[in-house]
Amino acid sequence: MSSVLINSIAVLAGLGFAVGVMLVIASKVFKIDSNPLIDDVASLLPGANCGGCGFAGCAACAEAIVEQGAPVNSCPVGGFEVAKQIGALLGQEVTESEKEFPFVRCQGGNQHCTTLYDYHGVENCKVALMLCDSRKGCTYGCLGLGTCVQACQFGALSMGEDGFPVVNKALCTSCGNCIAACPNGVLTFARDSEKVHVLCRSHDKGKDVKAVCEVGCIGCKKCEKECPAGAIRVTEFLAEIDQEKCTACGACVAICPQKAIELR
């Protein structure tokens, strides 16, 4: 073996040893002691790293709960059981709240809303909107390309025959990723105890809505006038229901000429 090769190996080994020593020293000097409670809380979280809590992942959520005062029930995937365990660990009392599920505020679909053209591109609502605007006559409604389904890592959403996403509540963790993925904001959270819903998001004038959709809200205010609880307000041609006031009497459902309000 030549002396040049031996010297090269020796220099390389020396450099490796020196760098290793420097790394060990640096790890000691710059060591940051973490709060052991963060690891304890993180071990209780499901590890889905879905971001439904609003943080980067489960580790960030645990840190926020321990050091930033985030609620112990921040994790929607873990639900009440995980929140209860974290609360016991941190000495906080936890009360169970009603779970929310994604809800589709549109019923135009393939049957009731005008389709402007056949789309044969990427099956993604955001991409379709960027390339050629809405394929539906109503620019507020569901495009039916399944971006929300693709965003759900728990397999809780599927596309129904009418072109709308269907939620499997048994699999849904209420992480909210499907809601965030919808470019038209058609999906929103709703509780099972909230019985009456306006199945429309259009703020267009009534005549424009009727021109493209058979079941869209036209802002006629009949529901607002009929509601005995004063739970409905029509703003910018769209009815909105105050769930705190709503008694689910069904008066608004019966009087709506467009059948845009549903009693579940």
Curated annotation (Swiss-Prot):
[4Fe-4S] cluster 4 binds at C217, C220, C223, C227. SUPFAM superfamilies: 4Fe-4S ferredoxins. It is a single-pass membrane protein. Its cofactor is [4Fe-4S] cluster. Its EC number is 7.2.1.-. Gene3D superfamilies: 3.30.70.20, Dihydropteroate synthase-like. GO terms for molecular function: 4 iron, 4 sulfur cluster binding; electron transfer activity; metal ion binding; oxidoreductase activity. Disruption phenotype: Deletion of the rnf operon abolishes growth on acetate and ferredoxin:heterodisulfide oxidoreductase-coupled Na(+) transport. The Rnf complex is probably composed of eight subunits, including RnfA, RnfB, RnfC, RnfD, RnfE and RnfG. HAMAP family: RsxB_RnfB. This is Ion-translocating oxidoreductase complex subunit B.
